[in-house]
A protein has these predicted regions:
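C-terminal accessory nucleic-acid interaction domains of nucleic acid-metabolism proteins
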Residues: 1-55, 62, 73, 77, ...
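Short, conserved phosphate-binding/catalytic loop or strand-edge motifs used
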Residues: 195-204
Length: 326
């Protein structure tokens, strides 16, 4: 029998709650069993404080992921997970875990080679039960691969990561609009979201048949064009010491097999419990405050605006010829 996910001591012997019943709890504390589909997931130490300044707990994170599960699971399903665990909250340094050796029966794993050539046992996101399992391990942010298990060498999208590294957020928004302009000139659409930290991610959906090398060449071409159109605002220079003050780093190098980025609707291990939230291009143009997107505000935003990122799953775009050459 494979071990479960109780991480300390005996679980309190109580009947399993449905996800709806869990959300109705006025106070989430101790240990709980929650039914997720036909599975029962043990959730432990729910009153452990993860964000000391706000008093947000592990239970608050789990509550959030249950609230947004019907949305986030569309973007996680069938993707290998890179776990970044904060079992004691954000006040302590987290750690990466890709090789997971012991899993309950309801969590799928797949042995894959990482970029260094090592064979690792990756958790595969499949349903609410698997999501709750990894969150219970202290995995605050969800970092899936860009490809699914059926087509591991073919990413579903290209990612352009706008990293301010000290530049004003207003500059990040300006650079995002340049990214949109470059994509339009190429006949492509992109979907922006906050990184959940200090930047913006632009995701470009692509059709089947493109490998990671093609995705990377396309991302590099877009990034170089952005930097050439707005040299005072943007750069593709990796060395921080070589960048001009106030430039936003246009990072295209996350487009490789085994790389990941925080999923849309993912919580981040950052102050205020911010969330990587989809935004409209009109919001990019008008400006907004990153602090407005947290575990306390995003569920209501979803109810009002729906899933602003769903085009990523519906749209299929062939990469321009430049990405297929060489």
């Amino acid at each position: 029998m494979r071990p479960g996910n109780n991480d300390a001591g005996e679980l309190v012997r109580t009947a399993a709650l449905s996800a709806t019943q869990f959300l109705r709890l006025k106070k989430v504390e101790g240990h709980k069993k929650v039914k997720a589909g036909d599975r029962v997931v043990d959730l432990t130490h729910l009153d452990k404080v993860y964000w000391p300044d706000q008093g947000y707990t592990k239970g608050d994170v789990i509550r959030y992921y249950i609230q947004v599960s019907r949305y986030i699971l569309k973007y996680l399903k069938d993707r290998p997970a890179i776990l970044v665990r904060y079992p004691n909250g954000i006040s302590e340094e987290g750690f990466y875990q890709q090789n997971v050796k012991e899993l309950p029966d309801f969590v799928t794993a797949l042995k894959l080679k990482n970029q260094a050539g090592r064979t690792l046992n990756y958790v595969i996101y499949s349903d609410l039960a698997s999501l709750l399992y990894v969150v219970n391990l202290g995995t605050i942010a969800q970092n899936p691969w860009h490809s699914r298990t059926k087509n591991l060498d073919e990413p579903d999208y290209v990612v352009i990561d706008l990293d301010p590294h000290g530049a004003p957020f207003s500059t990040v928004l300006k650079v995002a609009l340049v990214v949109r302009e470059v994509l339009r000139d190429m006949g492509m659409n992109g979907y922006p979201k906050t990184s959940g930290s200090s930047g913006i991610h632009v995701y470009i959906p692509i059709s089947r048949g493109h490998d990671y090398a093609e995705a990377a060449r396309f991302a590099e071409a877009v990034s170089n064009r952005v930097a050439s159109l707005a040299p005072k605002l943007a750069t593709v220079e990796r060395k921080i010491s070589e960048r001009k003050k106030g430039q936003v780093y246009v990072d295209w190098q996350q487009n490789a097999r085994g790389k990941s980025a925080a999923s849309v609707y993912s919580v981040r291990a950052r102050p205020l419990a911010t969330v990587s939230a989809p935004v409209t291009w009109d919001e990019i143009a008008g400006g907004f405050d990153l602090r407005d997107f947290t575990i306390k505000t995003v569920p209501d935003r979803l109810k009002k605006k729906g899933d602003l990122f769903e085009g990523l799953l519906k749209e299929s775009q062939r990469l321009p010829r430049l990405a297929r050459e060489q």
